[in-house]
Amino acid sequence: GKRGKGGTERSRIALLHALANIEQWAIDLAWDIVARGPRLSVRHMQSSDTDRPDMPLPRAYFADFCQMALDEAKHFTLLQQRLVDMGSFFGALPVHHGLWDSAVETREDLCARLSIIHLVHEARGLDVNPLTIEKFRAAGDARSVDSLTTIHLDEITHVSTGHRWLTYLCAVHPEQPSPVDVFRANVRRHFVGQLKGPFNAPDRH
């Protein structure tokens, strides 16, 4: 394809395909944290020497992650449609398993799952999405820009959800650890690689 500021069409298809792959994993991960939440929250509460009755997760936890699953399915559908519009399809290219590897790594610790999936991987998306959107804008691909903008705005709420429930779990734990300390400890323990900038501070906040 012809190369311009937005790269070749082939490179843009590859980028959309990679993003669709991430969204497909994200659908499963939203339902996974719904299903694992009750058992892992009990384990979280028992990780202290202090006796405290089990606190069931509030309904809002389940509502938040069910909404996230619906959002991720919408995102996958938007990206899949753009691939078809551009003469490709999801499954046409190889995919990577980084997100799923992190899910497996954090499968027994709810705070680790929230930290790594939602506050590292999804927050990283907030950093790179604007650059991706500009690449498609430079290529004159307004439909992809619209889809990617919709996805970006939803992902801001997903990072907020991860932050909200990590903060909640720290607050209800008998020892009330600092969410920042818990996050940093989980990144050191469970995340392979370095957190590299640039960071999109406005959307992260």
Locate each region found by the language model.
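Non-heme di-metal
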Residues: 1-205
